[in-house]
């Protein structure tokens, strides 16, 4: 497929590789079977991921993990689900009952819908009918996944607002800010893939990776997406909406029984979905890795499903690995990283990749390459200048506490300094005249008190 614009010379920039075969029109019972198959896969993947996460993190912490229910503890997640179903369903007195009950459903439903456009494999024969191993495909399938992941945050925000408690509200507000920040970086990381494949369809993107995976020609986009998908799913080290040490349990503090289980289910399904999307966009999708791709039957029949699941499992393991090894980010660090690092780097990479695509199909090498290099240098220089400015502020001691913020040495509740501020030891004497006589902020004992 080639996108043409009235014979414009830039039209071949978006020329794609040979696309996948046309989607077969499925009969009604085949659609039902595929729908139930996707639903069952997501539920089983969630149960397995919970078990795997508990076992792997336990090994990292020199523990054993669940090993009582079923062989190797494989049925422990199912037992926990039954336990949650039998627990008392409590609705707080101050909660908005209708919204409180609806919020988990709003969070879980888009998580299931987003997986509908992920291709598991090529065209296969089921009971004599040829069908793609994909529930459905859309011309804008990747944007559909992005939209569904955005809708899920509405359930989290409504859960925090309707609980009638300050901690869930803080968790909901954090989640909204987090999604707004990292959804932009995630969406921009898709642009590099679109430039190369020439399509927004997941099947066409997999077909465009027949000879070279997306990670090779969009490595920067892959790195940005890998970081953004962790922030998008509220997973460690970006699990700020449910930070136990700060806001108890975050947005689901007041939830119990099946409503809590729905939030848990939505979180893990979102993990599976963003991991499957990474596999589809950057890791060749269901196509066999080298050297297995040299086998003529590697990308035919049901074998591609195995390659897809192996890649998916590797990406999901990274989620577990991050949770067991990295501490939680501070909120200001997290937001600053998204807006000042990921988005500028992604925008610069899009310009560079677009310039490279233009160079490949035209004779504009004279000015396109220097222009791309100039943009890259400007982006790097801006980032370095920002780092130097921050370090110089820290080296100088940062801003001095004003009179209204000077702690009272006699108070049993001292005010902790904010990031970048320095104690006023040795400075109070020089600033004694700035304080009103007899005020609470007036320094005691000749200015020897600690700030």
Curated annotation (Swiss-Prot):
GO BP annotation list: aerobic respiration
A GO MF term: oxidoreductase activity, acting on NAD(P)H, quinone or similar compound as acceptor
Subcellular location: Cell membrane
First-tier enzyme category under EC: translocase
Residues passing through the membrane, by range: 30-50, 98-118, 138-158, 176-196, 213-233, 262-282, 302-322, 336-356, 368-388
EC number: 7.1.1.-
InterPro entries in the record: NADH_UbQ_OxRdtase_su1/FPO, NADH_UbQ_OxRdtase_su1_CS
One Gene Ontology cellular component annotation held by this UniProt entry: plasma membrane
Keywords assigned by UniProt, alphabetized: Cell membrane, Membrane, NAD, Quinone, Translocase, Transmembrane, Transmembrane helix, Ubiquinone
Entry similarity comment: Belongs to the complex I subunit 1 family.
Task performed by this protein: NDH-1 shuttles electrons from NADH, via FMN and iron-sulfur (Fe-S) centers, to quinones in the respiratory chain. The immediate electron acceptor for the enzyme in this species is believed to be ubiquinone. Couples the redox reaction to proton translocation (for every two electrons transferred, four hydrogen ions are translocated across the cytoplasmic membrane), and thus conserves the redox energy in a proton gradient. This subunit may bind ubiquinone.
HAMAP family per record: NDH1_NuoH
Protein name, per record: NADH-quinone oxidoreductase subunit H
Gene source species: Acidothermus cellulolyticus (strain ATCC 43068 / DSM 8971 / 11B)
Lineage summary: Bacteria, Bacillati, Actinomycetota, Actinomycetes, Acidothermales
Gene: nuoH
